[in-house]
From Swiss-Prot:
Any Gene Ontology biological process: glyoxylate catabolic process
InterPro entries associated with the record: Malate_synth_C_sf, Malate_synth_sf, Malate_synthase_TIM, Malate_synthG, MS_C, MS_N, MS_N_TIM-barrel_dom, MSG_insertion
GO molecular function, a single term: malate synthase activity
Cofactor(s) needed for function: Mg(2+)
Protein name in UniProt: Malate synthase G
Biological role: Involved in the glycolate utilization. Catalyzes the condensation and subsequent hydrolysis of acetyl-coenzyme A (acetyl-CoA) and glyoxylate to form malate and CoA.
Entry note: cofactor: Mg(2+). Co(2+) or Mn(2+) could partially replace magnesium.
Location of Cysteine sulfenic acid (-SOH) modifications: 633
Reactions catalysed according to its record: glyoxylate + acetyl-CoA + H2O = (S)-malate + CoA + H(+)
NCBIfam families attached to this UniProt entry: malate_syn_G, PRK02999.1
Alphabetized Gene3D superfamilies for the sequence: Malate synthase, domain 3, Malate synthase, domain III
Temperature and activity: Optimum temperature is 43 degrees Celsius.
Disruption phenotype: Cells lacking this gene show the absence of malate synthase activity and to the inability to grow on acetate.
Amino acid sequence: MTEQELLSAQTADNAGTDSTERVDAGGMQVAKVLYDFVTEAVLPRVGVDAEKFWSGFAAIARDLTPRNRELLARRDELQMLIDDYHRNNSGTIDQEAYEDFLKEIGYLVEEPEAAEIRTQNVDTEISSTAGPQLVVPILNARFALNAANARWGSLYDALYGTNAIPETDGAEKGKEYNPVRGQKVIEWGREFLDSVVPLDGASHADVEKYNITDGKLAAHIGDSVYRLKNRESYRGFTGNFLDPEAILLETNGLHIELQIDPVHPIGKADKTGLKDIVLESAITTIMDFEDSVAAVDAEDKTLGYSNWFGLNTGELKEEMSKNGRIFTRELNKDRVYIGRNGTELVLHGRSLLFVRNVGHLMQNPSILIDGEEIFEGIMDAVLTTVCAIPGIAPQNKMRNSRKGSIYIVKPKQHGPEEVAFTNELFGRVEDLLDLPRHTLKVGVMDEERRTSVNLDASIMEVADRLAFINTGFLDRTGDEIHTSMEAGAMVRKADMQTAPWKQAYENNNVDAGIQRGLPGKAQIGKGMWAMTELMAEMLEKKIGQPREGANTAWVPSPTGATLHATHYHLVDVFKVQDELRAAGRRDSLRNILTIPTAPNTNWSEEEKKEEMDNNCQSILGYVVRWVEHGVGCSKVPDIHDIDLMEDRATLRISSQMLANWIRHDVVSKEQVLESLERMAVVVDKQNAGDEAYRDMAPNYDASLAFQAAKDLIFEGTKSPSGYTEPILHARRREFKAKN
């Protein structure tokens, strides 16, 4: 059975047990909950006729489904050819012969002629501002609102509440405010100001008063007045210019707001009255329908579409409670200042939003066409677009894009022919909704091996709508393992970080982006910092991403965005990109194609046990939340109780790693099962405080989560590209049906 046949069988099983109430729309059978939302809430708001919409939607689905199937069959065909090659050429790989083979089968394609992308009408957050990017599950309205509002964040809070400030020398966090810790935060903030907006001849640490004189920032120390070294760094203020409430500064296109309030507890203890330093933080945010959510049916998908629609209308709200107080969270308004020339200056109060659709693989029961589930990527393209139309309306004061663009991230594409299919799909959606051509911008995730080695060709397939490329090391590692499953046993998971292909892959993404003209038109992005609690370490290490030429990189939280934003004040990314362009492109292809097989497999029994336990614990800790709680992205304690941000990409690596080691007899199926059972006890203990949690041990056969974990590992060589979605979706739907 091929990988695609395995997936089709699971899809058919799901469709066969369908009991969803449906409405006929354009010849499609649409789940009533989804139909009602789109027809009653969305279409009247965006001025689209319902009959025209549903019939046009059905035409797109019918026309493009065969091509979607062909592309998936092509994945299967290439994988079988590669598997056969490795079986017939075991041992040391002849790199030149291997590359010739990949060209012969069409895995490697000709590089396109020298040309640059032509994208127009992109917002400044993408074209000319370098800064952090959040990724947030769209099914959680609170998370979505917090992320959209994370455009601005308190540096003091981010420092005080994390390990960015050590809890030594009396600086413990504690339950009450600790002035010793607070002072260390203030000192850190002053050093930061000295680094990025220095005064000419003085330190911010010595300033006694800030105000505005002669249209410039004045920093008073005794009887002396000091100005900024770079006078252009001052942008504006609020309040009275002699006693301002806020002062706006800027470096590298990012803003810093000094908030002054001598009555505030923090401001009262500061000689300048400075109560906080607020940083422009999450410049862009991806609202995610993919790896960070568990959306398996019409109810789940409709919730996501509804939240996305509310973000675009500006009307999404969520009632919350904190410390016994109930309040309503809603989207922040824009920020208004008096500019340095005395006129009003308005800055965006919210993060610019992308939406991540699913890839080309999965089908979803929300809509049936001729009795078969619709390809979810086609459904997402149509429905996330129609829900985004209010976000480009000029009359909407809370609109998302000032340039009239809708930004869609398309993940898990294998090579330029699949990117071309996305371009065709987006064009059809624009025609359906009477949107100007190339209104839909695309973010191409460089997270599958066939895209990495054909990145230039993939970019040029969407040359008129490309808004970003981004490395996704986690998924990319999963595909690295699965593609070369038959080549031999892979190095340990931690050693993938230093394997030759990895750095070459990261370099190639930046180099291709620069050579194809992305700077000034599109983002070149890098991946996630997953260790949510280790912010000191993030401050130390993640600055490497802007230094490598990435003008955005992923962060796991608004707090992480604020701290990572400091890096973009310290590094002028666009200058780095100019230097990289001048240096010329690095020759990366040979290294990208260097398969990370282990030179030998003589690990000790303890090392093998450690690798099994780490992966089994990671898999179980994530899968149990996914299958039984519907949580697609969560902080999961690892085997050492360090919280890691886990999503399906991390699951893909761990399951493929173990599948590979079983395949090559590094470990046995029985050893892995024994590790799974021991780690289930560990995960049960880690979740002991959750009343809704169901133990996996000792009744493993009754736990759908445990069974899903087993499937992911033991069926890992058969799962399409090593993807986890088919198994997760099937088990989640089974759990929902039984509960």
